[in-house]
Amino acid sequence: SAAPDPDRIAVNVDQAKLVKLPGGIATIVVGNPLIADVTLQNGGVVVVTGKGYGATNFIALDRTGQVLVDRQIQVEGPTDQLVTVYR
């Protein structure tokens, strides 16, 4: 199997994950806010919350509009509660 992408953030639906980013971030833009919510906290920490299944990204900009971070977010269900239905 492929090695996990270190730039991809995996989070479960209705769960939150803390991610440390470089300082100087002024603005966060989320590709699809129906899939994930990204909230900037003090100290360059963002809270990534899974809202719907799928993949999106977020871009962090500094005050001049320069892109500091562009990361993929994968929102999935908890694998320990996965049910397979055979028809």
Question: Locations of the language-model features?
Answer:
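Sec-dependent N-terminal signal peptides of Gram-negative outer-membrane/periplasmic proteins
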Residues: S1-R87
